[in-house]
C-alpha cells in the first residue's frame, strides 16, 4: 500500500496522529495481542490495574479487561480514540481522549503498559514522560511493555540507545525482566525488547 500524503509533521501534536488514523496508516499496529503480554498476564496471580497511554486502536484493552484486569486506556488523538471505541465493543468505555501529562487515572495503578507510546514522541520529551510514569506509579508498581531500540535520528518511531534509556529510568525504576521479541511488526522487527521495570 502506498504511503498517503500527510500535512501534519509534528508527532507531539494530535493532528499528526489524526491524519494517520484517518487514512488507516498504522504500521506500528500489531493487530492483536503480543506474545510477551499474553505470557506476562498468564504469569500474574492477581489482576493489575493498568493504564495504557497512547493506546491507538487498543487491542490489549479488550484482552486485559476480559482477563479481569482493571484497565484504562488514553490517547490524545480523537480519531484514534474513536477507532478504539468502535473496535472494542463492550469495553469502549475503557478508552478516553486525554493528555498523558495531565490525565488522572480513575483508579490507583499497579502497572503502566508501554506499547509504542514512548517511541512515538520526540526524544526531547522522554525525561518528562518517564517523570510522569514515576508520578503515576507507587513503589512496587510496574512499567511493562515493549521498548524500541534504534540509532536512527528520524522518527517516529524514535529509537532509544539502551544505556541512555536505562540512565533515564534507573533513578526511579529497577529493571526486572529484559527479553528479545520474536513477533514484532515490520516497523519494529529486530529492534524492540520486552522489559519490565519496577518502581523503586
Question: What are the functions of these language-model segments?
Answer:
Residues 2-51, 56-107, 123-200:
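Class I (Rossmann-like) S-adenosyl-L-methionine-dependent methyltransferase catalytic domain
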Residues 110:
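Conserved acidic residues
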Residues 113:
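A conserved beta-strand element that flanks and buttresses the S-adenosyl-L-methionine
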Residues 116, 120:
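Short catalytic micro-motifs in class I SAM-dependent methyltransferases
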